[in-house]
From Swiss-Prot:
Gene3D superfamilies: Nucleic acid-binding proteins. It comes from Bacillus subtilis (strain 168). The gene is ypfD. GO terms for molecular function: mRNA binding; structural constituent of ribosome. The keyword RNA-binding applies. Plays a role in sporulation. Cannot be expressed in wild-type E.coli, does not complement an E.coli rpsA deletion. GO terms for cellular component: cytosolic small ribosomal subunit. One of its GO terms (biological process) is translation. This is Small ribosomal subunit protein bS1 homolog.
């Protein structure tokens, strides 16, 4: 800033001098001022009040306002003055410092124009639409009158060009918050989150400034075909932190671990002797795993599949088949349930007939009947 701009006690002002004036009258298109220590009065044309377009002078100043003004023309009866020129000189110096130090400052949005927002910071500052927010904004109408935190991203005094960014400030704050959150996260902690987006392999959940992944296997205790079957974008959920990779900024989360497990209080839901309907989930050499409740599987040992001898479970069962089973045993601590299909089978009539014929042959070959044997035993006890 020049020495002339700091000089306020000027007896005979010249063009370029800076003087102090007090507003005495506000007209629509100009402002009358009394210049301190100068006999001549001053006039500020409406075009010299601000770097922005002004409809009425009263929108910028009022009577008794004390202003620093630059002399732009000396006439016999009055000095022609500019508030805009003083504001601009000071603004450029201030903006150059802010640009060098990357200082964040605040300014009010004065106008919404095609392509962005306009602020008055002593000079006209422009915020392109792409630099307003970190997210897409369709309509900027509501931004007029808002105060935004800004960063100077481009400055050219010769071209009177000032480009500002609110997005840069937001992204910087988000990055700082993200790092703070990454450092504070603890494995095992349960947090509130919001589902941001769904993929084939899971759901990304915002836990307060950073997204973590809930893998599809961690969405539910039961099998999930696709994430959209369980959660939707925008849904608020509770998640448990499974792991934190601070170097790569990756967080693994689980919704499943915050929900009651399917084995929780299973002893009250399933008891020995219960007959249930289930679905064969897996066949192994030693039996079949049957889902009897969502997320709860029991084992039908190969010896409990059929009254008939079978070599492998595949001979009589297939995955996805619906079967009836009887509960033999429930071990809640080890999450094991023993089931039987054999106990629900009826003994084939052919087998019953074979047994009767066998019994008759035995009685004939020994020369006495079962009843005689029992009778003899009873007589010996008398």
């Amino acid at each position: 800033m020049t020495e002339e701009m700091n000089q306020i006690d000027v007896q005979v002002p010249e063009v370029g001098d800076v003087v102090k004036g007090i507003v005495t009258k506000v007209e629509d298109k100009h402002v009358d001022v009394e210049i301190i220590n100068v006999k001549q009065s001053g006039i500020i044309p409406i075009s010299e009040l601000s770097s922005l377009h002004v409809e009425k002078a009263s929108d910028v100043v009022k009577v008794d306002d004390e202003l620093d003004l630059k002399v732009t023309k000396v006439e016999d009866d009055a000095l022609i003055l500019s508030k805009r020129a003083v504001d601009a000189d000071r603004a450029w110096e201030d903006l150059e410092k802010k640009f060098e130090t990357k200082e964040v400052f605040e300014a009010e949005v004065k106008d919404v124009v095609k392509g962005g927002l306009v602020v008055d910071i002593g000079v006209r500052g422009f915020i392109p639409a792409s630099l307003v927010e970190a997210h897409f904004v369709e309509d900027f109408t509501d931004y007029k009158g808002k105060t935004l935190s800004l960063l100077v991203v481009e400055l050219d005094r010769d071209k009177n060009r000032v480009i500002l960014s609110h997005r840069a400030v937001v992204e910087s704050e988000q990055a700082n918050k993200k790092q703070e959150l990454l450092q504070s996260l603890e494995v095992g902690s349960v947090l509130d989150g919001k589902v941001q987006r769904l993929t084939d392999f899971g759901a990304f959940v915002d836990i307060g400034g950073i997204d973590g992944l809930v893998h599809i296997s961690q969405l539910s205790h039961s099998h999930v075909e696709k994430p959209s079957d369980v959660v939707e974008e925008g849904q608020e959920v509770k998640v448990k932190v499974l792991s934190v990779d601070r170097d790569n900024e990756r967080i693994s989360l689980s919704i499943k671990d915050t929900l009651p497990g399917p084995w929780n209080q299973i002893g009250e839901k399933v008891k020995p002797g219960d007959v249930l309907e289930g679905t064969v989930q897996r066949l192994v050499s030693f039996g079949a795993f049957v889902e009897i409740l969502p997320g709860v599987e029991g084992l039908v040992h190969i010896s409990q599949i059929s009254n008939k001898h079978i070599g492998t479970p595949h001979e009589v069962l297939e995955e996805g088949q619906t079967v009836k089973v009887k509960v033999l045993d429930v071990n809640e601590n080890e999450e094991r349930i023993s089931l039987s299909m054999r106990e629900l089978e009826e003994t084939p009539k052919a087998d019953q007939e074979d047994y009767r014929q066998y019994q008759a042959k035995e009685e004939t070959s020994t020369g006495f009947q079962l009843g005689d044997l029992i009778g003899d035993k009873l007589n010996k006890l008398k």
